[in-house]
């Protein structure tokens, strides 16, 4: 019976049972835990961050770095989209280039390589969960990320994971903690990209990110996104403001970077046919009387489209953007512009809330006048 046995543990952690009558020399001891609080000391730059994501899709695109930097002013940091998570075991695929980094360094620009859980390699919530819910897989991923960072000589790692489900939240933040420790040991800056805070993305745990990461970046765009059932601005003034004020409830201002778009969307709305209306009955789509398509355009292309349509823009005070609409081929077109006026309003928010800096998606989509403006606010 149980009374005849005692549960014991050896000094090296093996647990089992022994018979009471075999136990001799009993004594009581207080065991102290040798637990050391993890050090999450942070790297903080002594200048306003002006980071541009560089959407690099293949090895050859790295050669454009000289041309891209030459167009900018006041740029402090480049975040090339070099790294994809190749599989759920934590292997990475990389198009990182040491030449790119050394060129950027000669121009006094830091490089924080971006790693993503979409757009090549894994690209679903289930796969991100499969990856992050295993300690061993997180370890593989972190080891490969650090090795690649050291191989090409980057200054930091930028994490852009956008496929984190509710159940994955605890594993994701553990990954950020573990990566943070390794970045610290190797002198690498860790920045983490985040959605504008909403009730449905609390699993990203911005509060904990604000402790363990060096910088927390808000992606202040995709308010209305590709596949959105209705047309609207990509990045209205209030959306950016809400992103900042909500993030500041959990993260100190000196760690917050406000991400803004260099792109916009042209929306095409077409009335649904009788057949489409019928097939949408009883679904979420029923509330919309039009089908909506959109394409993303950089600033200059957006201006050209409006000019070609022969219409004028009007200032949409609520959105804080210039707006245009017109009809053609039985469809209605709408566009909320990103231009110097809308960008300046967003940069003023960065200043007002004394944030660490700004970030832009993405390099090459801006009009040439934008950099003079940005330089005014980051210096």
Residue positions per predicted region:
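Substrate-binding surface in catalytic domains of secreted glycosidases
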Residues: 88-95, 143, 166-302
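Substrate-binding cleft and catalytic face of glycoside hydrolase catalytic domains
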Residues: 76-83, 98-136, 143-156, 178-189
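Catalytic domains of carbohydrate-active enzymes, especially glycoside hydrolases
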Residues: 61-86, 144-157, 346-357
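Boundary regions of SH3-family modules and the immediately adjacent low-complexity/disordered segments
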Residues: 9-43, 48
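Glycan-binding loop/region signatures in secreted carbohydrate-active enzymes
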Residues: 31-36, 120-122, 127, 264-346, ...
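Conserved beta-strand/loop element in small beta-rich adapter and peptidoglycan-binding domains
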Residues: 1-3
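Acidic/aromatic/glycine-rich contiguous surface patches that form carbohydrate-binding/processing clefts
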Residues: 342-379
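Conserved, mostly hydrophobic/aromatic
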Residues: 78, 159, 179, 216, ...
């Amino acid at each position: 019976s149980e009374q005849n046995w005692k549960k014991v543990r050896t000094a090296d952690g093996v647990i089992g049972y022994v018979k009471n009558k075999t136990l001799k020399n009993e004594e009581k001891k207080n065991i102290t835990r040798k637990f050391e609080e993890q050090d999450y000391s942070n790297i903080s730059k002594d200048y306003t961050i002006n980071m541009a994501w560089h959407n690099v899709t293949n090895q050859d695109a790295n050669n454009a770095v000289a041309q891209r930097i030459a167009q900018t002013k006041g740029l402090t940091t480049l975040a090339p989209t070099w790294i994809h998570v190749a599989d759920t075991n934590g292997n990475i695929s990389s198009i990182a280039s040491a030449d790119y980094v050394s060129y950027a360094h000669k121009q006094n620009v830091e490089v924080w390589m971006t790693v993503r859980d979409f757009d090549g390699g894994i690209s679903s919530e289930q796969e991100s969960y499969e990856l992050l819910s295993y300690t061993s897989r997180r370890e593989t991923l972190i080891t490969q990320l650090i090795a690649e960072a050291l191989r090409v000589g980057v200054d930091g790692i930028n994490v852009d994971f956008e496929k984190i489900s509710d159940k994955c939240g605890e594993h994701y933040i553990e990954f950020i903690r573990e990566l943070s420790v390794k970045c610290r040991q190797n002198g690498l800056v860790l920045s983490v990209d985040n959605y504008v805070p909403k009730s449905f993305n609390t699993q990203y745990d911005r509060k904990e990110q604000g402790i363990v990461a060096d910088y927390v970046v808000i992606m202040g765009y995709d308010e209305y996104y590709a596949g959105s059932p209705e047309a609207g601005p990509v990045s209205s003034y209030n959306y950016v403001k809400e992103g900042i004020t909500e993030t500041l409830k959990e993260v100190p201002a000196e760690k917050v970077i406000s991400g803004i778009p260099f792109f916009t969307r042209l929306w095409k709305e077409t009335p649904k046919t009788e057949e489409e209306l019928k097939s949408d009955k009883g679904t979420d789509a029923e509330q919309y009387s039009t089908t909506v398509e959109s394409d993303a355009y950089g600033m200059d292309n957006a201006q050209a489209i409006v000019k070609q349509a022969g219409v004028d823009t009007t200032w949409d005070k609520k959105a804080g953007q210039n707006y245009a609409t017109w009809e053609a081929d039985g469809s209605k077109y709408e566009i909320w512009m990103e231009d110097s006026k809308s960008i300046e309003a967003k940069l003023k928010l960065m200043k007002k809330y004394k944030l660490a800096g700004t970030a832009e998606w993405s390099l090459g989509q801006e009009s040439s006048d934008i950099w003079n403006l940005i330089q005014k606010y980051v210096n």
